[in-house]
């Protein structure tokens, strides 16, 4: 992988490596090495029964070594929609997938679902189109590794903030403050919220 990054740098080609070994900070030496996987990503939430707490641990472990391409954006989480014989569902929710764009840093982000899925969930896909990929400021508002994490980030060069909060399999109420925001300003918020308390489907959500 290092050799590929070196040669790619000579030709001014960006690299996003998957199945790579653990990150060692060499993306600073080779800034064209934009991101890498180096941990279990979204596909394992479906095919390997990845536990929900996995992504609440990554910010304290894998992401210390550099940007991670987690390949988020799976909005159709129930497999029977595509194949009635498959009764399983991915260990995630639609809104949690959106939150990954904030909680799992990468300057190169994916929209990993099918185009027709994004047509069906157009308002959720709008968030993927709108969310920044680089940031001026980052605040960890609350966190407990293995349980939950809530992160607030300011879009680079813009007066736009994005907040992502994820949890394990247990629902919870986040207690956060916004005292880091400039005083005397008003903000308009678009909120994407799971309806896990009122609906059994992990794809149900509300955007307000």
Stretch-by-stretch model annotation:
Residues 181-193:
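Solvent-exposed beta-hairpin/edge-strand motifs
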Residues 100-136:
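Catalytic cores of secreted or luminal carbohydrate-active enzymes
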Residues 15, 103, 163:
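Conserved, mostly hydrophobic/aromatic
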Residues 197-202:
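Conserved small/polar residues in nucleotide/adenosyl-binding loops
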Residues 131-150:
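Edge strands and adjacent loops of beta-rich recognition modules
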Residues 1-91:
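Aromatic- and carboxylate-enriched substrate-binding clefts and catalytic-loop regions
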Residues 12-19, 42-47, 109-118, 137-139, ...:
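Acidic/polar loop patches that form or flank catalytic/metal-binding clefts of enzymes
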Residues 145-183:
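Carbohydrate-binding surface patches
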